[in-house]
């Protein structure tokens, strides 16, 4: 096997190899082939097959001369599609078939023996004697011909699989379909053998007679001529039909075609197969077939009966009967496979009788058809030739497997024949072209490009750039699924740095952090060598960073010394005397099982020997894999391969499963450079350390390592270390963000656009020349009984509308108008049928760009104006128009790897993004008297936490997260009321996984509560209790005004006040009044927290009296209005921290009113303990009820704090620890549908391995009969889980209800559900039918809704729906699939809006074949890649899954992006609007929020200098909009309208303060707190900043030091 990058290089390579073989007559051809099999594969390929050295040389000679002869396959992969293995039927048999392969290939022999033994159980004679005997007539008898073909075909298929030729589809011809069914996994070997023998025996027992005639005619021509007793047996090609039946009738038809000059051929058969003459055997055969149990195909399987992919009835008894009687639709099968993307057909059987039929059947397109065992050619040469033919045109072949067991060994062969061309420009006088031209020193090193000497010190810095493009060999160093720069590479970098300063010894080098390599991403490296000390030693460090905007990461550090180590021992005697060879024939396979997935460049280890405690190894640099050892001291791939011997030696002696990496190198000296073939000796160097001596091929010294220490690392630790080091890629989940856009009414000339017409008018033909037609979907409502039915009805209607529209070919726009089908963040999706219609319409948009616009609105809109905006999808809420953009989901805070002593803290920058994780060692200190240590599961977030994070808390801010819940880990002295294992809630004093707390401040969690529910109680209920009961001493019959009544403290205070007989008045924003009404308030007792109208309203309701108590958390004029509402003797309780008044001034201005600003901490531990007990008792007696809770993973704290700061929550916001979800799932049961599919199986294994789930229920229609179910269950059981595989059609409501009823009786509580089932039936919109929609909807919509209803009353922690990105972006040809998945997306939002667990994972493309991706060809994958979507591995998919669960937004788009492809589409103007926020734009200055303000001002002033006034303003407007977008959580500055008022954009007092903080840092100006309200739009603020920057200071509208008096987070109480 030879390959090259060009045709010229291929012939040159053949010439070099031919000359080498001729010059070395001792070379064994097997060794040559084995060595070539390990090389990299390029585009231009050739395979030479020969039985002798002479034949191989002749083949190489013809190839080198450009005239390839017999036994030589030459080709170049084009658009490689799917591969099909075809099994021939009766007539292909011949005496001796398979005998040569049986003797040459053990895999063929093993498979043949297994099949023959099974067949012999049913045959009257041993099959081997028949096939390899001398009686051809016996073999030709149907009784033996059919089993014989089955045996040879199954064994041939085993060879193909062993060689790595893995087909996408299989099909057979007549009895050959039984071999195909077995190959696809439908039939077990025992069942298939029984069936094939019975088939042949029963046919043989029929009376002889009848005729079969092949005629050159079409099926349509033959069909009218058929009469009684004769039929069509096979349609082998469009113009090749076999007639079968009574001899006279068959011959009569044949004679008619012969008379027309058509080719007619009488087949030599004993019976007329596939004809009416077969009917006497059918009944008995049906009884045999009924004993066979069919399974779901593991490969695509095409049916002879239908000519299409096997359907649900494939393999039934009736099917096999029909298969005997009905025609073989072989031509239809071949054509259907071509429509599925098949380009390569391999006939696996004796002869090549089907190749012609396939070629005739296929459309005139590129397709290769080869036969594996051609007649009149040695069988092994024929099989190898077939493999070579498909390989040269793109089908993967594992040539190393071909040579396995041959005894071949790797030998030195000529390296690649480079076709050298010069692409470098000749340096001119205009600029430097190398390091010297830039004033830098050149290194002449392959990894380091330049050296810089510090002029003011003795320090030296060496720089370089690494990438998988420039150093492709690095891509072969894969550890636990991650491409790592090898530890040996750091040694090479430091050795070169030592050479620069005259230090020949690495005294020590410790690896601090991995250097991860990502495709398409370059990495800068710097080796920093410090100044020499008195003894000449120098510190050395290696740093890396991904791009200019990232910080440097320390990867390694150590010390250099001057003197080299002593010369190592002599290894000239080789192999060493007395050393025993160690078998490493499967060495790299063993290493792969332990996480070392080394590619060819790192597979240089060729031999190992052992002598006592010593170990010896030989390594050869794989030059053909791009490992060039020149310009290196010791190539990292060579040194790394040396160390592989250690891994294999451990494997051989200890059966270790650890993955270990180099950690600390000591005493390293390089004695010679450029070695490509080395010998190595290993010896013990103390505890856990080894020494290494490396010599060249003559035994002379190359490298010495006095001591090397390795350390184990798991895949999880590696991922955590990569993340903590900032080395993770930016490929996290995406979310759909609806951003406000500006809409200008009127056309270009200011005139209004023509009015739109309705769909009814369009259908009636009365639409005239309207440019916009509107089809409005009537809302289906939300009745549970009608939801599924409404989805079917709506999608059917939508299909009819879309098909009519697209068929009309009108130059107009169709507007699909819905209400509640999509929504803003946090909104309920009230019309799930509309959600499904959006999915279908998105697919129609993708197929027909520019013809359809989707609009979802809450009020009447002008569709003509919106249709002209240029956005394909729009959402209108409250008069504001929004457009969707994909945006990276919020980044997770990085947690310390393997560290539990940490705490969430404010970062000090005045913004919520500054939240950080800080070490907290005090929680691990020894316990004092009365203390307990708690493993925290959940922490409540309060308003004061948000205030503290923004730097607004007066005085010393407390730790974030005052309250929480968890489990007691340890008790200190004098603790009597609590024990280890108790679940407790209370005041834990910080947001982290561990807390130490006084026992007085916690109490036990009530039975049946979750930790999140418990964490929501202490602060809010005790704050309300302390304020109302202790401070206000409120009494029955009095009245209280509670501001922010839907917040945590507000809802708690409402419950307590009512419990005590108090009349309650409450405020909230109007959007939350329905919540208040649901709490039992009438409108007379509800006020608006965004205006002061509540004062007048409540005075009127109370007939001018007012209220007795105010519980306040507002600021500014809201405080004054509330004070005016108090009666004489009234009590004003201030919980807020932003507007605290002077009590004496209040008393003077409001006679008789008592003003008290308070904090719960004033109560003291003893009183807090009493209140905790009292509250707990009221919960136990059900006089108090738990609050609504919104949970966030603590790693999403910035998003949670922002959610709370914007007053979007109802009840409490709670942060859960990363382990909380795993703990909940591990304690309960998780139900997975579709678990045997590609996605479901990966997630099932991940839940067990990563989350510790111990009870799994895998539901599918076929239960344990589903393909792969038994294997999956066994794997999960071995991993420690209890697994139940159940047969349940989840689309059947009664079946689902029954399943969950059973689970409630027999299993731990269900805590999680994953719905991963689904089916495909792809077609473009114009080809879809209602039936095809229903097929796809049933598996997704019915099933998901049934699961939703069955679990709505359960306390789930996870309800995950496996959706598809097709629903989000609109996938051409998948309108039904997009509709079904859009329903899932809407259902997840619907559940979250109802307070239930719910997330929809819109999966992108999985790299793993099978399941939903089985139908995709390489052409499909390439198209998807060009679109900007990259395939993800299972490891990458579960990382996205974990991140999505942590972020917990209703919709997570789980896909990897190809940024280069996105950029290319953007530059070509072909990037959909939805993706526009993901393409990298021209580089702009980014504001450094943590930078020095003075430097920011200076930099900004420099940018403004020299610009015209309008240009300055434009720049500043962009700056303000950028910071505003960051505060509002929008993707970019373009998502903020510069002329919209901040209040309308969504700003309130808190967010206004944050924006002011950001602008202060970005501009360097001292900005007043009221700047956002004094200048109400981004443009106005930019104008103000421009004046300040120019030195002009306008008159302020008020005192710049005054308090902000705008509405202050009206619904957020101080502790809620």
Curated annotation (Swiss-Prot):
Matches recorded under SUPFAM superfamilies: ACP-like, FabD/lysophospholipase-like, GroES-like, NAD(P)-binding Rossmann-fold domains, Probable ACP-binding domain of malonyl-CoA ACP transacylase
UniProt keyword Transcription regulation, yes or no: no
Name of this chain's protein: Putative inactive phenolphthiocerol synthesis polyketide synthase type I Pks1
GO biological process terms on file: Actinobacterium-type cell wall biogenesis; DIM/DIP cell wall layer assembly; fatty acid biosynthetic process; lipid biosynthetic process
Region span, Enoylreductase: 910-1215
Keyword set includes Lipid metabolism: yes
Any GO CC annotation of this UniProt entry: plasma membrane
């Amino acid at each position: 096997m030879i390959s090259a990058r060009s045709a010229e290089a291929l012939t040159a390579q053949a010439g070099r190899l031919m000359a080498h073989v001729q010059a070395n007559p001792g070379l064994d051809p097997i060794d040559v082939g084995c060595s070539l099999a390990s090389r990299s594969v390029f585009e231009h390929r050739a395979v030479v097959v020969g039985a002798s050295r002479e034949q191989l040389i002749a083949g190489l000679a013809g190839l080198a001369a450009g005239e390839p002869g017999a036994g030589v396959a030459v080709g170049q992969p084009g658009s490689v599609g799917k591969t099909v293995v075809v099994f021939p039927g009766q007539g292909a048999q011949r005496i001796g078939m398979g005998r040569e392969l049986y003797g040459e290939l053990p895999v063929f022999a093993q498979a043949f023996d297994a099949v023959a033994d099974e067949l012999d159980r049913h045959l009257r004679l041993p099959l081997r004697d028949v096939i390899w005997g001398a009686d051809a007539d016996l073999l030709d008898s149907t009784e033996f011909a059919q089993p014989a073909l089955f045996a040879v075909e199954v064994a041939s298929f085993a060879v193909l699989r062993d060689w790595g030729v893995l087909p996408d589809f299989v099909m057979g011809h007549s009895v050959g379909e039984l071999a195909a069914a077995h190959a696809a996994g439908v039939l077990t070997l025992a069942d298939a053998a029984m069936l094939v023998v019975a088939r042949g025996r029963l046919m043989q027992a029929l009376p002889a007679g009848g005729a079969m005639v092949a005629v050159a005619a079409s099926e349509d021509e033959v069909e009218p001529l058929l009469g009684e007793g004769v039929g069509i047996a096979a349609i082998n090609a469009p113009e090749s039909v076999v007639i079968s039946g009574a001899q006279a009738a068959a011959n009569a038809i044949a004679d008619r075609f012969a008379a027309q000059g058509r080719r007619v051929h009488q087949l030599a058969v004993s019976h007329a197969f596939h004809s009416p003459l077969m009917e006497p055997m059918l009944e008995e055969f049906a009884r045999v077939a009924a004993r066979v149990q069919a399974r779901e195909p593991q490969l695509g399987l095409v049916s002879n009966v239908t000519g299409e992919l096997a359907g649900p009835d494939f393999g039934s008894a009736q099917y096999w009967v029909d298969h005997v009687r009905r025609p073989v639709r072989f031509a239809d099968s071949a054509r259907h496979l071509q429509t599925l993307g098949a380009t390569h057909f391999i006939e696996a059987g004796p002869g090549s009788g089907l190749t012609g039929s396939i070629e005739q059947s296929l459309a005139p397109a590129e397709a290769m058809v080869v036969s594996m065992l051609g007649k009149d050619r040695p069988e092994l040469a024929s099989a190898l030739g077939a493999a070579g033919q498909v390989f040269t045109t793109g089908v993967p072949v594992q040539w190393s497997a071909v040579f396995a067991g041959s005894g071949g060994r790797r030998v030195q062969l000529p390296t690649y024949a480079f076709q050298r061309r010069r692409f470098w420009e000749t340096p001119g006088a205009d600029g430097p072209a190398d390091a010297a031209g830039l004033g830098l020193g050149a290194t002449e090193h392959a990894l380091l490009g330049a050296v810089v000497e510090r002029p003011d010190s003795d320090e030296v810095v060496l720089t370089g750039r690494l990438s998988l493009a420039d150093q492709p060999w690095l891509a072969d160093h894969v550890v636990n699924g991650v491409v790592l720069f090898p530890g040996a590479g750091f040694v090479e970098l430091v050795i070169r740095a030592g050479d620069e300063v005259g230090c020949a010894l690495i005294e020590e080098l410790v690896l601090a952090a991995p250097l991860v390599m990502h495709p398409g991403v370059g990495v800068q490296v710097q080796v920093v060598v410090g100044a020499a000390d008195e003894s000449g030693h120098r510190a050395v460090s290696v740093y890396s960073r991904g791009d200019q905007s990232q910080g440097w990461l320390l990867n390694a550090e150590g010390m250099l010394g001057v003197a080299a180590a002593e010369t190592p021992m002599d290894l000239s005697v080789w192999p060493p005397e007395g050393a025993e060879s160690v078998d490493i024939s499967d060495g790299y396979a063993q290493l792969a099982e332990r996480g070392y997935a080394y590619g060819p460049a790192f597979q240089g280890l060729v031999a190992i020997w052992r002598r006592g405690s010593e170990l010896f190894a030989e390594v050869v640099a794989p030059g053909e894999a791009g490992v060039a050892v020149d310009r290196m001291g010791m190539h990292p791939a060579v040194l790394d391969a040396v160390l592989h011997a250690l891994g294999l030696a451990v494997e051989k002696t200890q059966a270790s499963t650890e993955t270990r990496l180099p950690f600390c190198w000591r005493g390293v000296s390089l004695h010679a450079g450029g070695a490509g073939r080395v010998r190595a000796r290993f010896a013990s160097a103390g505890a856990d350390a080894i020494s290494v001596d490396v010599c060249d091929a003559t035994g002379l010294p190359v490298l010495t390592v006095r001591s090397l220490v390795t350390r184990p690392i798991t895949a999880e630790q590696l991922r955590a270390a990569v993340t903590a080091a900032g080395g993770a890629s930016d490929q996290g989940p995406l979310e759909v963000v609806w951003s406000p856009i500006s809409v200008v009414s009127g056309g270009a000339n200011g005139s209004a656009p023509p009015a739109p017409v309705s769909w009814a008018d369009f259908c009636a033909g009365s639409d005239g020349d309207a440019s916009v037609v509107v089809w409005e979907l009537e809302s289906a409502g939300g009745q549970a009984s009608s939801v599924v039915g409404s989805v079917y009805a709506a999608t059917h209607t939508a299909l009819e509308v879309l098909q009519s529209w697209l068929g009309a070919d009108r130059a107009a726009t169709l507007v699909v108008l819905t209400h509640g089908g999509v929504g803003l963040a946090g909104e309920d999706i009230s019309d799930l049928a509309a959600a499904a219609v959006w999915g279908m319409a998105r697919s129609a948009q993708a197929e027909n760009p520019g013809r359809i616009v989707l609009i979802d609105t809450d009020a009447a809109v002008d569709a003509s104006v919106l249709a002209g905006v240029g956005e394909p999808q729009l959402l209108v809420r409250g008069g504001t128009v929004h457009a969707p953009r994909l945006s990276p989901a919020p980044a997770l805070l990085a947690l310390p790897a393997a560290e539990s002593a940490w705490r969430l803290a404010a970062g000090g920058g005045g913004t919520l993004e500054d939240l950080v994780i800080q070490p907290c060692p005090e929680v691990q200190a020894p316990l004092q008297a009365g203390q307990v240590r708690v493993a925290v599961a959940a922490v409540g977030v309060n308003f004061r936490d948000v205030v503290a994070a923004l730097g607004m808390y007066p005085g010393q801010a407390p730790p974030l997260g005052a309250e929480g819940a968890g489990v007691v880990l340890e008790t200190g002295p004098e603790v009597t009321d609590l024990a280890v294992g108790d679940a407790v809630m209370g005041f834990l004093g910080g947001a982290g996984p561990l807390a130490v707390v006084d026992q007085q401040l916690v109490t036990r969690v009530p039975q049946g509560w979750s930790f999140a529910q418990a964490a929501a109680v202490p602060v809010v209920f005790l704050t309300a209790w302390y304020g109302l009961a202790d401070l206000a001493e409120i009494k029955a019959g009095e009245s209280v005004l509670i501001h922010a009544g839907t917040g945590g403290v507000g809802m708690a205070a409402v419950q307590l006040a009512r419990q005590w007989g108090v009349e309650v008045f409450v405020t909230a924003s109007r959007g939350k009044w329905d919540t208040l009404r649901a709490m039992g308030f009438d409108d007379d007792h509800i006020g608006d927290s965004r205006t002061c109208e509540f004062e007048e309203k409540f005075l009127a309701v109370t007939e001018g009296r007012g209220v007795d108590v105010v519980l306040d958390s507002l600021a500014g004029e809201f405080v004054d209005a509330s004070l005016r509402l108090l009666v004489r003797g009234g009590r004003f309780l201030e919980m807020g921290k932003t507007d605290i008044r002077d009590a004496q001034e209040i008393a003077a201005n409001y006679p008789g009113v008592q003003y008290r600003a308070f904090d719960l901490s004033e109560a003291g531990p003893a009183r807090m303990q009493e209140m905790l007990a009292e509250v707990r008792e009221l919960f136990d007696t059900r006089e108090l009820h738990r609050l609504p809770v919104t949970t966030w993973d603590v790693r999403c704290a910035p998003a949670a704090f922002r959610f709370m700061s914007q007053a979007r929550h109802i009840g409490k916001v709670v942060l859960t620890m990363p382990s909380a979800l795993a703990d909940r799932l591990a304690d309960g049961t998780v139900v997975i549908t579709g678990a045997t599919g590609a996605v479901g199986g990966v997630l099932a294994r991940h839940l067990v391995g990563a989350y510790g789930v111990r009870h799994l229920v895998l539901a599918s229609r076929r239960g344990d009969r589903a393909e792969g179910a038994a294997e999956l269950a066994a794997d999960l059981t071995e991993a420690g889980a209890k697994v139940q595989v159940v047969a349940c059609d989840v689309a059947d409501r009664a079946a689902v209800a029954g399943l969950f009823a059973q689970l409630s009786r027999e299993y731990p509580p269900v805590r999680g559900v994953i719905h991963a089932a689904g089916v495909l039936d792809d077609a473009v919109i114009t080809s879809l039918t209602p039936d095809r929609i229903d097929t796809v909807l049933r598996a997704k919509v019915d099933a998901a809704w049934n699961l939703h209803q069955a679990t709505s009353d359960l306390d789930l922690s996870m309800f995950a729906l496996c959706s598809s990105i097709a629903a989000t972006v609109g996938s051409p040809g998948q309108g039904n699939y997009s509709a079904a998945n859009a329903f899932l997306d809407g259902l997840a939002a619907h559940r979250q809006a109802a307070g239930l667990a719910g997330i929809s994972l819109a999966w992108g493309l999985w790299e793993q074949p099978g399941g939903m991706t089985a139908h995709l060809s390489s052409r499909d994958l390439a198209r998807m890649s060009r679109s900007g979507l990259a395939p993800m591995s299972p490891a990458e998919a579960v990382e996205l899954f974990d991140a999505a669960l942590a972020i917990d937004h209703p919709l997570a788009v789980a896909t990897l992006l190809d940024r280069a492809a996105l950029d290319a589409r953007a530059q070509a103007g072909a990037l959909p609007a939805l993706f526009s926020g993901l393409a990298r734009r021209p580089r702009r200055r980014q504001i450094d929020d943590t930078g020095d303000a003075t430097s920011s001002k200076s930099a900004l002033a420099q940018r403004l200098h020299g610009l015209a006034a309008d240009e300055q303003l434009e720049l500043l407007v962009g700056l303000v909009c950028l910071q505003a977008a960051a505060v509002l959580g929008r993707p970019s500055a373009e998502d903020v309208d510069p002329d919209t008022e901040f209040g309308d954009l969504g700003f309130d007092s808190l967010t206004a303060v944050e924006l002011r903080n950001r602008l202060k840092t970005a501009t360097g100006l001292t900005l007043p707190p009221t700047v956002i309200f004094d200048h109400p739009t981004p443009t106005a603020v930019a104008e103000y900043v421009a004046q300040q920057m120019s030195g002009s200071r306008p008159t302020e509208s008020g005192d710049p030091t005054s308090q902000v008096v705008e509405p202050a987070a009206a619904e957020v109480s101080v502790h809620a």
